């Protein structure tokens, strides 16, 4: 069987869509479902399209790791140092040395705990209802609803946040986040299990409500994406039957991963710079408009 170049082209289109939408509040999953249906990428049997989307999401996540490597690596080192220092403090006679190490590594430890706390709610729901979510929520109809609902929520919550920010203090340093704030953001991340809602939009809205600045909420969203998506991806990749893979599939997989990674590198940098100057309203308006158009296309049976 020869190489299907048309299928590879379709796969690369999906990878570009993933890279463009994963970290902006418009729902990458929703767009991949929609575009996949439009170009007939989702018609291949055996579950390859679903597995492919998981792999290219990992490519997007790798972009976060590369761009924020200094923060991630230093936090991991400090997190482990704090744990070992705490153990040493309890078991060693040289308490002064370990107390100093605890103080020096506390920032990284708190950051790590915040990421863990923020990951737990969606991880629990995702594990408990993984199959139900895949069966009942992954459709163009639910995506259309998610686009509209998420867009309206973005407008309302951002307006309230900007009013509140004028009269009360907001957290502008990610290392100053509290455990309560990370838990609230994590609870909002559960909304992202609904395709069309957007993980980025959900967590940023949770950040606004908890008192985080837009930049801090967005960067925390990036960090939450690493365990959330690696965990969800691992489950799907473990279940997939690789014996049915052909040369076209493998080429699509490798190229798609690379393309999603490169596009995400560019988008993350541009998105953060955009947020420092302008509000999210443009994304919210786009979501509502796209949701309405999608609903019309479904109603008129242009797409199913």
Curated annotation (Swiss-Prot):
One of its GO terms (molecular function) is undecaprenyl-diphosphatase activity. Keywords: Antibiotic resistance, Cell membrane, Cell shape, Cell wall biogenesis/degradation, Hydrolase, Membrane, Peptidoglycan synthesis, Transmembrane, Transmembrane helix. Bacitracin is thought to be involved in the inhibition of peptidoglycan synthesis by sequestering undecaprenyl diphosphate, thereby reducing the pool of lipid carrier available. The chain crosses the membrane at residues 5-25, 47-67, 72-92, 111-131, 137-157, 209-231, 248-268, 283-303. Catalyzes the dephosphorylation of undecaprenyl diphosphate (UPP). Confers resistance to bacitracin. GO terms for cellular component: plasma membrane. This is Undecaprenyl-diphosphatase. Disulfide bonds: none annotated. Pfam families: BacA (PF02673). It is a multi-pass membrane protein. Its EC number is 3.6.1.27. Belongs to the UppP family. It is found in: Cell membrane. The keyword Zinc-finger does not apply. It comes from Clostridium perfringens (strain ATCC 13124 / DSM 756 / JCM 1290 / NCIMB 6125 / NCTC 8237 / Type A). GO terms for biological process: cell wall organization; peptidoglycan biosynthetic process; regulation of cell shape; response to antibiotic. It is an enzyme of class 3 (hydrolase). Its main location: membrane.
């Amino acid at each position: 069987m020869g190489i299907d170049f048309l299928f590879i082209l379709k796969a690369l289109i999906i990878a570009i869509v993933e890279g463009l939408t994963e970290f902006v509040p418009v729902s990458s999953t929703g767009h991949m479902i929609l575009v996949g249906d439009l170009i007939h990428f989702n018609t291949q049997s055996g579950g390859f399209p679903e597995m492919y989307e998981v792999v290219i999401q990992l490519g997007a996540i790798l972009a976060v790791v590369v761009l924020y490597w200094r923060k991630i690596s230093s936090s991991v080192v400090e997190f482990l140092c704090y744990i070992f220092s705490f153990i040493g403090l309890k078991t060693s006679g040289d308490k002064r040395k370990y107390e100093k190490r605890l103080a020096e590594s506390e920032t990284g430890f708190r950051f790590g705990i915040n990421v863990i706390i923020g990951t737990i709610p969606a991880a629990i729901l995702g594990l408990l209802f993984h199959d139900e979510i895949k069966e009942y929520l992954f459709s163009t109809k639910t995506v259309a609803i998610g686009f509209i609902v998420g867009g309206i929520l973005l407008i309302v919550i951002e307006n309230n946040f900007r009013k509140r920010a004028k009269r009360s203090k907001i957290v502008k340093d990610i290392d100053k986040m509290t455990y309560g704030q990370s838990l609230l953001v994590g609870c909002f991340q559960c909304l992202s299990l609904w395709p069309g809602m957007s993980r980025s939009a959900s967590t940023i809205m949770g950040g606004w409500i908890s008192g985080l600045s837009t930049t801090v909420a967005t960067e925390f969203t990036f960090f939450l994406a690493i365990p959330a998506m690696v965990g969800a991806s691992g489950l799907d990749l473990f279940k997939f039957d690789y014996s049915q893979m052909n040369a076209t599939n493998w080429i699509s997989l490798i190229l798609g991963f690379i393309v999603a990674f490169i596009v995400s590198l560019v988008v993350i940098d541009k998105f953060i710079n955009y947020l420092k100057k302008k509000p999210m309203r443009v994304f919210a308006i786009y979501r509502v408009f796209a949701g309405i158009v999608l609903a019309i296309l479904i109603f008129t049976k242009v797409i199913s």
